[in-house]
């Protein structure tokens, strides 16, 4: 039982494969065969959309305006910051010359925010793409929201489509029209023209909006020299095998295919440094073929490319050559989540799947061969008048591309990981990342995910990234201070790893056996001898495959409470599972009841040292199911009026001293200047016939040695009677830096030497001036104080003794004598709301008048506490 929430419904309706050859575009394959019918191979979802009715409308809405979609280059780096160059924005209309009405049966489950739709024949359809913008919801028929575009009278691709159109006319003249030659009530020739854009859409986000359906793809065109990948500019080691699971997951801004328009990359090869790529690649598959490149495969790659000479590629007599393919995903997202859902599936599924196909097309002409194979099977089925189910069973069994599209649709629709094998050398895994944690408790109008891990541990903080804010996405690379929590039984995970085989299997099995949720990656590296980079790569692999989660290492001095977001509906089932795992220990209700009391370190629940490992196993089990969460303390520096007044007094004294020093050094000079001025004035008055008035000049009579406090560091709007919070000590202003310096200056000197080996009370006998520069950067309200001992490699007892001296309120202070001069922390504990059938407790800490730092302790990361005077 794990606390990972399934991704939202991807709203996937169908997947379409369109190819274009010299003869024209072809509607090759779509899955499922009847997307909006419960009679198809795949039943319609039970909570998809309102039922559809038959429609006789010959109008359709346009898609969104030209700024509604975003276009990206092929080069991305999910591990590092993505910097895709903006491409040009364009809007074009495609014809939809169809006159028959469409009717279909839809799923029977409405979803809030969805519109009912009459999906019919389209007259006007807008294809839009905007590299920098977000998609907006396309308007429905007659809604007035969509930008209605003029229907194009002539087909720009008329010459290319002539051959295909004539072939279709022969088919239509026959008495039998196969059901697989239409989709959503429209004939195949409509979709061929609509979803076959011009070359300007090469490797850009292609989006068509028809009623409330969105058609999104990433078209790929052949290069002008007839190849699918740009030749190398620099002589590098050839790479002929698939090395990265999902292309794009491994790429960096400097890497790419270098294909024609829209590409910034000048070379075909990725960076020679494969360290980062190996980490990303490991998250995709355990196939050993991804880990090495054989000489025969390299030779095959070179021979394939050398075979495709320019003369052969551009041979005008060769009519059987593919020039474009486009895998189009048909989506039906909710109205209010249109942009978000399209962005998720485009970035994580559409683009990466198309890149994988492009790779194989460049290597072995894969897409074109499979398209011809599928078309051949369909022609035979048409002659035999096979049923749709029989045809699709044969296609999926005989065509690897049809099987791959089927796998992607089935897995992504079920919010699972799609593991696709295009060939023995190329495999890819695709998924929409699931929700693993949340830093917020849901509000009354928010969608709740009961059982989801409630924490801020995986959020980017100012210590991690000084330029980050609270809305920054979590880090992509696992930090060395994290630990790994398996989301399933270790034995079952090891069994799956060993059964999967592959080059990573032995390393994964060894790491899983060495890993403990109480030890960080860095500690495991030291104890096991596994390099830290390898551990991070293996941990990323397990996290990607939803078999583990990165957490702060479990420790007995940390405080854990019952999560306010725990799923009580699963309590009965969880109790039985807990009893089976820990039959001789306190039951699950008893453990939750004990942990729902006054928050205290987890070590206080452990009866003896012999039970330590067992109770940590219990804690890991509770965290895995989202039953408990860590109570973390956060702090901000509070500057009292006394500190402000002391700093202001010092600043004014500095101004006075500066004034006096200038005046003393200039006194002799002023006397000489006065004598010279008197003599020159008398002589000039004798020889002048003017009025004797001097020309007024700005600042002429202002002496340099006059006392001027206009440049004081003190902001005139700052009140000296109220306290202030320093939000970001690492970016403190000059005045805030003076305040922090004054706080440190007021700490008493060293209280006494600590005997060698006596670390029991080291934190109580050490001068705070020694640790203040280290601790101050964590007092920003975003970094938990529990990070300090882990990140700074300090003993936890030492850290918490220092924090208690600073004013952090804990339950262990009764026997400790605190110096009032060191009490610069003001602590506040939020109400700890526990599960309903146990109890609700609250702890209110003292509010010392001399406090300077506020430290709220909570689980959801919100610092909504204002200190009082």
Swiss-Prot record:
GO cellular component labels:
GATOR1 complex
Question: Where are stretches of biased composition, namely Acidic residues?
Answer: 254-271
| Record field: compositional bias (Polar residues) | 115-129, 842-853
**What's in the keyword line of the UniProt record?**
Meiosis, Signal
Entry annotated with the keyword Signal = yes
Give a short account of what the protein does. Mediates inactivation of the TORC1 complex in response to amino acid starvation. Required for meiotic nuclear division.
Identify this protein by name. Answer: Nitrogen permease regulator 3
Tell me which species this is from.
Aspergillus niger (strain ATCC MYA-4892 / CBS 513.88 / FGSC A1513)
- The gene coding this protein: npr3
């Amino acid at each position: 039982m794990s606390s990972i929430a399934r991704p939202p419904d991807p709203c996937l309706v169908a997947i379409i494969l369109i190819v274009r050859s010299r003869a024209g575009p072809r509607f090759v394959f779509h899955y499922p065969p009847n997307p909006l019918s419960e009679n198809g191979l795949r039943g319609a979802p039970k909570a998809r959309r309102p039922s559809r009715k038959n429609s006789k409308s010959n109008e359709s809405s346009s898609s969104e305006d030209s700024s509604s979609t975003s276009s990206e280059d092929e080069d991305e780096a999910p591990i590092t910051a993505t910097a895709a160059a903006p491409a040009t924005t364009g809007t074009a209309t495609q014809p939809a010359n169809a006159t028959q009405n469409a009717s279909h049966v839809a799923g029977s489950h409405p979803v809030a925010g969805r519109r009912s739709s009459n999906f019919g024949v389209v007259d006007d359809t807008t294809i839009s793409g905007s590299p920098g913008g977000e998609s907006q919801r396309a308007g429905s028929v007659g809604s007035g929201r969509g930008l209605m575009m003029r229907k194009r009278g002539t087909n720009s691709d008329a010459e290319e489509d002539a051959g295909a159109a004539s072939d279709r006319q022969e088919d239509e003249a026959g008495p039998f029209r196969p059901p697989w030659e239409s989709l959503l009530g429209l004939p195949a020739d409509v979709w061929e023209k609509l979803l076959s854009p011009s070359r300007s859409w090469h490797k850009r986000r292609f989006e068509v909006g028809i009623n409330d359906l969105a058609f999104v793809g990433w078209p790929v065109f052949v290069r002008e020299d007839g190849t699918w990948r740009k030749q190398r500019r620099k002589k590098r080691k050839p790479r002929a095998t698939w090395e990265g699971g999902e292309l794009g997951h491994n790429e960096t801004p400097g890497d790419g295919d270098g294909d024609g328009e829209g590409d910034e990359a000048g070379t075909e090869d990725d960076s020679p440094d494969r360290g980062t790529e190996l980490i990303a690649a490991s998250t995709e598959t355990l196939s050993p073929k991804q880990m090495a490149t054989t000489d025969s495969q390299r030779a095959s790659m070179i021979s394939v490319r050398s075979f495709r000479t320019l003369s052969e590629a551009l041979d005008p007599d060769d009519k059987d050559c593919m020039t474009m393919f486009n895998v189009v995903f048909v989506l039906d997202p909710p109205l209010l989540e249109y942009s978000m859902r399209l962005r998720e599936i485009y970035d994580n599924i559409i683009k990466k799947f198309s890149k994988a196909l492009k790779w194989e097309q460049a290597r072995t002409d894969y897409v074109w061969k499979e398209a011809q194979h599928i078309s051949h099977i369909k022609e035979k089925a048409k002659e035999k008048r096979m049923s749709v189910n029989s045809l699709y069973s044969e296609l999926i069994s005989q065509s690897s591309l049809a099987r791959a599209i089927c796998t992607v649709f089935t897995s992504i629709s079920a919010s699972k990981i799609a593991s696709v094998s295009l060939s023995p050398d190329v495999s890819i895994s695709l998924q929409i990342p699931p929700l693993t944690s949340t830093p917020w408790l849901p509000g009354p109008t928010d969608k709740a995910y009961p059982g989801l891990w409630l924490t801020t541990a995986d959020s980017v903080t100012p210590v991690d990234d000084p330029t980050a804010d609270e809305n920054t996405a979590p880090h992509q690379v696992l930090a060395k201070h994290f630990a790994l929590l398996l989301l399933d039984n270790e034995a079952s995970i090891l069994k799956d790893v060993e059964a999967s085989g592959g080059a990573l299997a032995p390393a994964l099995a060894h790491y899983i056996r060495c890993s403990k949720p109480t030890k960080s990656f860095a500690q495991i590296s030291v104890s096991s001898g596994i390099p830290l980079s390898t551990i991070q790569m293996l941990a990323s692999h397990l996290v990607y495959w939803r078999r583990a989660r990165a957490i702060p290492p479990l420790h007995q001095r940390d405080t854990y409470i019952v999560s306010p977001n725990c799923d009580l509906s699963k309590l009965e089932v969880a109790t039985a599972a807990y009893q089976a795992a820990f039959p001789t220990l306190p039951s699950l209700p008893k453990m939750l009841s004990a942990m729902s009391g006054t928050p205290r370190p987890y070590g206080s629940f452990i009866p003896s040292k012999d039970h330590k490992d067992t109770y940590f196993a219990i804690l890991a089990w509770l965290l895995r199911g989202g039953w408990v969460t860590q109570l973390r303390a956060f702090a901000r520096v509070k500057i009292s009026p006394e500190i402000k007044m002391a700093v202001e007094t010092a600043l004014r004294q500095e101004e006075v001293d500066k004034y006096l020093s200038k005046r003393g050094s200039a006194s002799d000079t002023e006397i000489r200047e006065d004598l010279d001025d008197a003599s020159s004035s008398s002589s000039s008055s004798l020889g002048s016939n003017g009025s004797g008035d001097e020309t007024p000049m700005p600042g002429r009579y202002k002496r340099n040695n006059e006392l001027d406090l206009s440049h004081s560091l003190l902001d005139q709007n700052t009140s000296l009677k109220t306290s202030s919070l320093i939000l970001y000590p690492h970016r403190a202003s000059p005045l805030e830096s003076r305040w922090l310096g004054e706080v440190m200056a007021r700490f008493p000197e060293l209280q006494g030497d600590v005997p060698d080996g006596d670390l029991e009370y080291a934190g109580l006998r050490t001068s705070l001036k020694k640790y203040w520069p280290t601790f101050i950067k964590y007092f920003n309200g975003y970094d938990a104080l529990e990070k300090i001992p882990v990140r700074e490699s300090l003993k936890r007892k030492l850290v918490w003794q220092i924090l208690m001296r600073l004013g952090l309120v804990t339950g262990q202070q009764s026997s400790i004598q605190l110096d009032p001069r060191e009490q610069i922390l003001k602590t506040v504990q939020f109400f700890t709301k526990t599960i309903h059938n146990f109890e609700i407790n609250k702890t209110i800490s003292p509010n010392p008048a001399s406090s300077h730092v506020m430290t709220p302790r909570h689980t959801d990361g919100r610092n909504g506490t204002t200190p009082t005077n």
